[in-house]
Regions:
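Histidine/acidic residue-rich metal-binding segments in metalloenzymes
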Residues: 3-157, 173
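Cytochrome P450 core scaffold surrounding the K-helix E-X-X-R motif
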Residues: 168-170
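Short phosphate-coordinating micro-motif centered on Lys-Gly-acidic
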Residues: 160
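Gly/Ser/Thr-rich active-site loops/lids in small-molecule metabolic enzymes
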Residues: 62, 175-189
């Protein structure tokens, strides 16, 4: 999402404008600079296969961005909807914001409830089928999301349907995981 990133000042102005109109801002929360550092670290270590993808985007990358967007929303007086939430740590930040009285919402996806990081341990290039962002996480994050769902803390579940053909698309990253188109199918047709 490098071409979609905003400076915090621009994000604040946009969120403030949406808030003035009574709107809600949806936020994909990953710190792009930290992701770039993670990708560079994986490359420097010679890790270029799809199994390196989750290591380039550890849970803290999501949590930092969730905290930042919650702060921007609070300062701007605009509710935020954190989309594709995948970690317990990010969920705890949302809980803290809600405890302060901040209006914020959470969306997660079936893949974060049902799949985990073991999908990145498949033989050969098969793990490329599971390259998405945020990446699949450790099982304890899945369990935390299920608990939050049962407690009514997750407001929506969305598919984030973003499918790519394995042959001809996902294969673009055969030599470099950072070139694999991110996304998995979320709708059967």
């Amino acid at each position: 999402y490098d071409n979609l990133r905003l400076a915090d000042s621009a994000a604040y102005e946009a969120v403030r404008a949406v808030g003035r109109e009574g709107g809600l801002v949806g936020c994909h929360c990953e710190n792009g600079d930290l992701v770039a550092e993670g990708v560079a670290a994986m490359h420097a270590a010679g890790r270029r296969g799809p199994e390196a993808h989750p290591h380039s985007r550890p849970p803290l990358v999501e949590a930092e961005a969730v905290g930042r967007w919650l702060a921007i929303g609070e300062m701007a007086g605009c509710p935020v909807n954190i989309v594709h939430l995948s970690t317990r740590r990010a969920l705890e930040l949302v809980r803290a914001a809600r405890a302060r009285g901040q209006a914020c919402y959470v969306e997660t996806c079936p893949q974060y409830l049902l799949l985990d990081e073991r999908s990145y341990r498949l033989p050969g290039f098969e793990s490329a089928k599971f390259v998405l962002s945020p990446p699949l996480r450790a099982q304890e994050n899945c369990a935390a999301l299920w608990d939050a769902l049962e407690a009514g803390e997750i407001d929506t579940i969305g598919t984030d349907h973003c499918s790519f053909r394995f042959h001809g698309a996902k294969e673009l990253g055969r030599e470099d995981f950072s070139k694999i188109p991110n996304g998995i199918p979320g709708v059967e047709h």
